[in-house]
From Swiss-Prot:
The lineage of its organism: Bacteria, Bacillati, Mycoplasmatota, Mycoplasmoidales, Mycoplasmoidaceae. The active site is at residue 177. Its EC number is 1.1.1.27. It comes from Mycoplasma genitalium (strain ATCC 33530 / DSM 19775 / NCTC 10195 / G37) (Mycoplasmoides genitalium). It catalyses: (S)-lactate + NAD(+) = pyruvate + NADH + H(+). The gene is ldh. Pfam families: Ldh_1_C (PF02866), Ldh_1_N (PF00056). InterPro entries: L-lactate/malate_DH (IPR001557), L-lactate_DH (IPR011304), L-lactate_DH_AS (IPR018177), Lactate/malate_DH_C (IPR022383), Lactate/malate_DH_N (IPR001236), Lactate_DH/Glyco_Ohase_4_C (IPR015955), NAD(P)-bd_dom_sf (IPR036291). This is L-lactate dehydrogenase.
Length: 312
């Protein structure tokens, strides 16, 4: 079986959720797991090999090292310390995880890897920027998961509120993947119609405020109940991998290197992008209301401050 070769760095719940989702989509011919924890790495390889035996399209699963990455097409990085229970923010994770990401980036660069990297380690916008700076890879080939999951939560919440299918909802969360993210109401649509067609004009601001609070609380509530989030980001990231490896030119909300969009340069945060085998084919800039512009400016400031703290 010939096809793309996919590797993950970090075989925790997020990495293995991504890998299993990628396997069920039959995205690759070979899947390699890299992890500093040799015992966990091999255990996950065995478990996924058992799963693959029931479905020949799953591909081959192996344990590997950074030195083997040269001929791989796609890497998913989720390694790092996870958020602690009790309301720890993603940005509080920054200091330790920056050093972990620097180490990973150096090893991947040394391997000669020339494919696309998708990063989900938190705080993801800073981790993605760290990886890009250390590797010096082409910016279109370095992608953060950004507000991918936030946007999925927004679509789910809108669909649930108005009793519609989430497939018919077009709505985005942009900016930092964290507490300063910006839910875009001004351009949100269901089946091409603005939300005002589904809600009383007097209620829409209140209703959207409730939806916005739902998506902001969602991750913290999951972490408080089960310790971590992983199925949502794993599945959403596998979907991004599919759009890239199959060269679909479809739009997903990920974190590219900004080059002036929204007045932001040399930083990464969530915005809709066209995805292709190149990675980022095109960055799309959404038209914002004045309120949304102010909120995004605050999100950009938060990220700038944390880039300084990371000393990049």
């Amino acid at each position: 079986m010939k096809g793309p070769k996919i590797a993950i760095v970090g075989s925790g719940a997020v990495g293995t959720s991504f890998l299993y989702a990628a396997m069920t989509r039959a995205l690759g011919s070979e899947y390699m797991i890299i992890d500093i924890n040799e015992k966990a790495k091999v255990g996950n390889v065995f478990d996924l090999q058992d799963a693959s035996s029931s479905c020949p399209n799953f591909g081959k699963v192996v344990a590997g090292e950074y030195s083997q990455l040269k001929d791989y097409d796609f890497i998913f990085i989720s390694a790092g310390r996870p958020q602690k229970q009790g309301g720890e923010t993603r940005l509080q994770l920054l200091e330790g995880n920056v050093e972990i990401m620097k180490s990973i980036a150096k090893e991947i660069k040394k391997s000669g890897f020339n494919g696309v990297t998708l990063i989900a380690s938190n705080p993801v916008d800073i981790m993605s920027y760290t990886y890009l700076k250390v590797t010096g890879f082409e910016p279109n080939k370095v992608i953060g998961s950004g507000t991918l999951l936030d946007s999925a939560r927004l679509r789910y919440a809108i669909a649930t509120k108005y009793q519609m299918s989430s497939k018919d909802v077009q709505a985005y969360v942009i900016g930092e993947h964290g507490d300063s993210s910006v839910s875009i109401i001004s351009s949100a649509k269901i089946a091409g119609l603005s939300l005002k067609h589904f809600s009383k004009a007097s209620d829409i601001e209140k209703e959207f405020g409730e939806i916005d609070q739902f998506i902001r609380r969602r991750a913290y509530e999951i972490i408080e109940r089960k310790g971590a989030t992983f199925y949502g980001i794993g599945e959403a990231s596998a979907d991004v991998a599919e759009q890239i490896l199959k060269d679909t030119k479809e739009v997903r909300v990920v974190a590219p290197l900004l080059t002036g969009q929204y007045g932001a340069k040399d930083m990464m945060f969530g915005t809709p992008c066209v995805l292709s085998r190149k990675g980022i084919e095109k960055i799309l800039e959404i038209e914002l209301s004045n309120t949304e512009k102010v909120a995004l400016e605050n999100s950009i400031k938060v990220l700038k401050d944390n880039i300084k703290l990371a000393k990049l």
